[in-house]
Amino acid sequence: EVTFDVSDVEEPQQENTVENRKKKASYVIASPFDGIAGDITTAPDEGFAGKMMGDGAAVEPTDPVVKAPADGEISFIFPTHHAIGFVTADGMEMLLHIGIDTVKLNGEGFEILVEEGAKVKKGDALMKIDLDYVKSHAPSLVSPILCTDLKENEKVRLLKTGAVKAGEDLFAVDIYE
């Protein structure tokens, strides 16, 4: 009886990009606020647009309440209150960065509603933004919502552009074999 392993069969060489592999899972990240969603490459900041901090989406908030984008845990709160580190229940490390160059506001315009280490559910309020203050004191309200530790086999797929509501699917992280 002849047996052979499928891996012994030569296949025509395909471009070995991640997208050609089989997708094995997807995690969906919700928008943390009502606003206008766009691709991260549209963020008005080269570091974020160039995905130096991670990949995700950029959302300009129209509502002051920042909500948890998934079930998870608050991993850190910047001393200047303009950004929150978040780890989803699936272990995805995220950064919710409100506005551009907002570190310079030294916490003015941001009210944190949670503590580091807090376990939260998708939709729980994390922060309140004084939209008028931040808009008039920072270059932009556009807020990068990022996955900061994506592995080589994990890719972001934007699910929503334009008007988005808090809790609506914003992007997926597809995990390939």
Model-identified regions with their sequence ranges:
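Contiguous, well-folded functional domains in the mature portion of proteins
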Residues: F4-E177
